[in-house]
Structure formats: structure tokens, C-alpha cells
């Protein structure tokens, strides 16, 4: 892709988004890594910020929450300075990551403090509003969530049949409608998103819609839908969505009195959520697992075991004496992202130098 155009070309990021929309997530990741590296090498700040945003969306789709948050922040830092409308997309992506980590109060403050008018692009408006609707749902403010998804529906009314990968608003609106006591509308919205996901052959969106449909069902119908969602999502790169599906199935099995299988499903979801860095999701699953009679091992808050897979990889490279710049080149992230990971590593390991890091990692 970069053979014909540099990272500053007008279509490179659009091409990566197209790969993501089609479910070709790994190809999108590889292309985004190359674009980020090219932009960094050229010192092209705007191109770097835009490419970081695209990669944040890919990381988020894959469930790699910490990496998505770091790239979204890098994009927000760069795009916010240029009044680029995509700064709102970066902001919403950052908020989505905070939701996954259970940082709901901080996420709400970030949205409120931004004080930015909605962007002139309807699709960006819809993405921001959908994110705010998710936040309101997690905070159990159903009326506010209804208002946000209603605004999204008004924006996209004339879009026609659109691939739901990037904006799965119907299934979220369906869950909210169900909680608001409107089962007919709930079934209609989620059913339409399932149809569109099958039409465009996008398994991640299909799996998400199935899981959300199960939230509106009961008994064996819900359990069957969740098993189907797991089968669909297991064939994709969407690890966090798969974690949610396993957790939902475990919750349903517990309520059906099938506690042994419930614990097994919840254990799978817990492991996946931990690997994704989705600490808020992990905490919810841990609570459900305890209710099912399980004794989940407490998450390590300090020490090597507390490091996420990405943090461990960065720590191992740093312990080899590789500089932050060198780590950035090897892991295809920015130096700021490496510095952010290093701060987390030092905090979790209670150290202040790389010499101490070498001892801990080797032990």
C-alpha cells in the first residue's frame, strides 16, 4: 500500500478502514503498523495522529484495550491541536477504552470536559453519541441512553443499509429498548442488525448482535443464542467480545442452576478479559464467578504477574537494554506509548530503574 503512497497519502487510512470493515483485522493491523512507522519516520505529525487513530480502532476491535487507549490518546493529542473533526473519534475511542476498564466517572468527566461541538461529519457525530449512550447504559441511566441512541437513529436514518461493524447502534439500542420496557422495538432493532451483519458477512458484528439479542431472551433460547455467538466470535480476532459472550453464557447457566458449566464459562471469560486489559469487565466476571460458587484467583495488582501481555513484552525488551525508541520500532508503537507502558511497569513492579527491572524479569 505504501509503495505507491506514503503515510501522508489521501487514501491509505481509508484503505485500512475498508479492511477492518470487511473483518480482515490482521491485515488491517499490519497495514496500520506500517503507516504509523512511516509517519513517525517522516516526522509527519498529522499523518501520525491520523494513523494512530485508525490503529486505535483496530486495537479496540481486537480487544487490546491498553494499546487502543494509548493510540487513541496519541491521536487525540495530535488531532486536537489542529481542530481536526476526527479528534472527536479519538475522544470517543478513548472513552470506550475507559468503559472497558471500569473508569466510568473518569470517562464521563472526559466527555464533559471536552466541551467540543459535534463534528460536521454525521458519521462522527453518530459514533460519539453511541459511545455516550454506552456510557449512560453502563451507569444505568436508561433515559439518557435512550436519548443518545435516538439521536444516532436520526443521524443515520438516510444512510441506507450500512455495514454495522463500526457503528453497531441497532443492537445497543435494542438492549436499551428492552430495559426501557419496549420488547417489540428491541426485537426489531436487533433483528435488523443481525440481518445486516449476515448480509455484509461480518462475523464480529454478527456475534455482537447475537450476544445482545440473548440479553433480551430467557431460558434455553438465550443460552442457545449465546452458544451461537461464542461459535461465531471464536473464529474472529475480537477477544473481548468473545470474553463477554462467555461471561453472558456463564451468567445464564448460573441462573439456570447449571453451576459447574457456569463456572467453566465464566473462567474462560475471566481469562480473556484479563488478557485484554479490560479490568472493568474482568471485575464484573469475577463477581459473577464468585456468585456461581467459584473461587477465582485474585488478580495480581503488583509484581510480574500483574503485567499485561504487552507490558511483559515491553519489560522483557527493556531488560535486554533496548531503548524506548528501539522498543517502539520493534513493537510498532510510538515512543510515548512505550513510555506509558514503562510507567505502568515501574508502578506495578515498585521499581525506579532498568537495572532493577533486569533482576525481576530474569527471576
Task: Annotate each predicted stretch with a short phrase.
Residues 1-8:
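Flexible inter-repeat linkers and adjacent short helices
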Residues 248, 287-290, 296-363:
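Helix-turn-helix DNA-binding segment
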Residues 1, 15-304, 341, 363:
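Helix-coil-helix junctions within alpha-helical repeat/solenoid scaffolds
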